[in-house]
């Protein structure tokens, strides 16, 4: 599974009969969806980019000077004149120089002098700014079902599907082959102020240097360098890279201030680096809030027979995934396809299966399968795959796991923000409350009641509510009613 290889992983667990779940996807993260009776899926935000954004300004980092000319006049002879002064693309400076008999003037005094030089820009020495258009930014979301095949981090799963969204996109339906269809309706949000963001790109001259940065518009517009708009052949403020020496009679030296790339790179230290891939300019931050429809998903392999328990062997022994789950892979030498008998028991309870399978209904196929991921309660456990067994100690605590999943649920609801609430009708408002409860408490509820069946949870909720109605102490009554209501809501709810 894709999420297994990423550090930033979240789990969203649907309750009995779940048909829709709401996800918050961010760059660099991955969400695993599990729901009873449905295949598990990994969903992640793969990229945020715009193709060929519009250019705003080009800056020159190294001037190319040519055709220097100087004109001088003796005192009282009027101002010196060069026709280049009126030409676009030249830099000129007027001054006064000391004149006399030694330099061909009949009078001693200050005479007029003017120097001009043609200014262009050296090749591969430009810094170009690009601006994003919020309506053209593409958000790429990828979906991958848990098929039971092990896929390395640098490999691509054959069942991986891609959906793209913009601010005007509508619902997208992805076909996952034998696992049915999944629908995605995503609201997009960039993590930066696009109106104040410029991508500054340098002409690439060295492989080891970054070539683009994400900078503020005001900082970009204030750069003290020659600039022009795209398509204009002449540079504005070209004098910023030209220095004129002190005048001497009929001579005035012109100096090129040199390459300013190093100065610009020093100013960009600590600025977020932008990623450019071909004509795609990527954003480094942003998120999408997606409503995922699970109603047309279907489990694969439910009609398979159980595998022969004696013909399994470990290919990868159980290993900590780093996400509070255990991953393993087995090989099978018997008749295929078949369903893998897998369970786990806690110390002192040999008859109770405590494994919560992230890979639902694991199977061995004719061309693969055998990868299993599960979540176990903290403490000593024994994992059984057929007749294979492996002792496993799960670190952590149940209370800590509950707090962690609740914290993630609150973060998820905070990111969804106003879109989580529907005040248009009473039904919509109460539905929003139910969805918010699922978002915040769904993970904690699953951690506590993960191994409890539907009917026991239903009876527990009814019993708590009955105790609340029949308890005379107001505080106890409200506590029982709230607990019972939450258990019933999480058990009977169809949206998360």
Swiss-Prot record:
One of its GO terms (biological process) is fusion of virus membrane with host endosome membrane. CDD domains: Flavi_E_C. GO terms for cellular component: host cell endoplasmic reticulum membrane; membrane; viral envelope; virion membrane. InterPro entries: Flav_gly_cen_dom_subdom1, Flavi_E_Ig-like, Flavi_E_Stem/Anchor_dom, Flavi_E_Stem/Anchor_dom_sf, Flavi_Glycoprot_E_cen/dimer, Flavivir/Alphavir_Ig-like_sf, Glycoprot_cen/dimer_sf, Glycoprot_E_dimer_dom. Glycans are attached at residue 154. The chain crosses the membrane at residues 448-468, 480-496. Keywords: Clathrin-mediated endocytosis of virus by host, Cleavage on pair of basic residues, Disulfide bond, Fusion of virus membrane with host endosomal membrane, Fusion of virus membrane with host membrane, Glycoprotein, Host endoplasmic reticulum, Host membrane, Host-virus interaction, Inhibition of host innate immune response by virus, Membrane, Suppressor of RNA silencing, Transmembrane, Transmembrane helix, Viral attachment to host cell, Viral envelope protein, Viral immunoevasion, Viral penetration into host cytoplasm, Virion, Virus endocytosis by host, Virus entry into host cell, Zinc. Residues 469-479 are cytoplasmic. This is Genome polyprotein.
